[in-house]
Amino acid sequence: MNGNKSLYPIWLGVLGVALLAGLVAGAFIFMHGHVLFNANDVLIWTLPLGVYIFLALASSGLTLLSALPLVFGIKKFEPVAKRLVFLAIATLCGGFVSIGLELGSIFHMIYILLSPNLSSPIWWMGAIYSVELVVLAVKFWKMHTGDYHSSFSKFLGTASFALALVAPLMIGSVFGLTESRATYFGPLMSIYCLLMALLSGTALFILYSMVVERVSGSGSAGEHHAVIDDFCRIFTYATGIVMVFTILRFIMESATTIPAFLAYHQFAHSFGAWHGFHFEVVLGLFLPFVLMLVPSVRQSTGGKVVTSSLILLGTLAMHMEILLAGQSHPVGPKAEQFPQYVQYVPSLWEWLVLVFALAVMLLLYTLGERYLKLNEAPTG
């Protein structure tokens, strides 16, 4: 982001304030634990876990997009391959910041590493994403040194693609295998997470590309413009597919008489749902899809920024809606001391975890764009 040097120190200052606030929040969370979160015996997964899911899936989506040139050999996408890999790394780092603070203690992170549970989808989720981060880092280093086409570099590209396919499926299985929670259970959750990964990753790359183009003051070259247009097509298709899955999910939920779903229809949360009406789906999924069908919106920089921003906000809210709805209806002995469904509003500390994770991610974006020559394309 070299084009507008006067804004660069201001931007770094904003990130510095956000990082400082996040570090203070992290210190308090590690000292006092989950008592700082608005969690309870029923609702134990809150905003920090939702942020982790959102960023981890977006990272997987970016990795899947990078496979177009690196695995499938589509050369027109090679100029953006290095940037895609780096964005995947930075986004996943932000996700790890959020999940690290969600655990409430740094000793919990060490304990997970030292006591693997091979029968736990949650452990496999963390293990796969940890391996994916290492593979992506090595792949980026190989690309940074100009090695795109050696056998080892191609192996890393294929491995990262495979991990990016499996990781969202594993996140979905964390919820889909939970038989005691009807709103989680089912095989479609893994497929839904994979589609959401592709959608949010594509939206993030389009938004980032438009911002970099604007800040750097460089207009899109013909080839780069064509690549962004192709990503916009992928973005539109992914939005449409996720929209169909979402509609089918609503239809199935509305036809059931399972108590958990009946309570779910009355559930309201601070991320867009109110008495069964999901504003986050309408504004964060349906509206962007309609806008992307309009050629003038789809081809304009402002249209790309607005639609991709709406999708990112919408997908985060949709992740939170699914996460909270599955816990909102107390079951077993807990049903005797709690209301029919439990409400949730994030605490200040949870919002600071979100700020910290995004600040780490954006700082890595900024430094990478400035010093790591992310617009390099392979030669030969």
Functional labels for PLM-detected ranges:
Residues 2, 8, 14-21, 76, ...:
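Long, contiguous internal "core" modules enriched in hydrophobic/ aromatic residues
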Residues 28-37, 41, 69-77, 81, ...:
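Juxtamembrane/interface segments at transmembrane-helix termini
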Residues 302-380:
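TerminUS-proximal long segments
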Residues 31-36, 107-110, 254-262, 328-336:
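Peri-membrane helix termini and adjoining interfacial loops of integral membrane proteins
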Residues 28-30, 49-52, 123, 189-193, ...:
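Membrane-interface transmembrane-helix boundary segments in multi-pass integral membrane proteins
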Residues 14-34, 97-103, 166-175, 365:
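Alpha-helical transmembrane segments of multi-pass membrane proteins
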Residues 1-48:
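N-terminal regions that are enriched for targeting/export leaders
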Residues 43-107, 122-124, 128:
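Membrane helical hairpin/interfacial module
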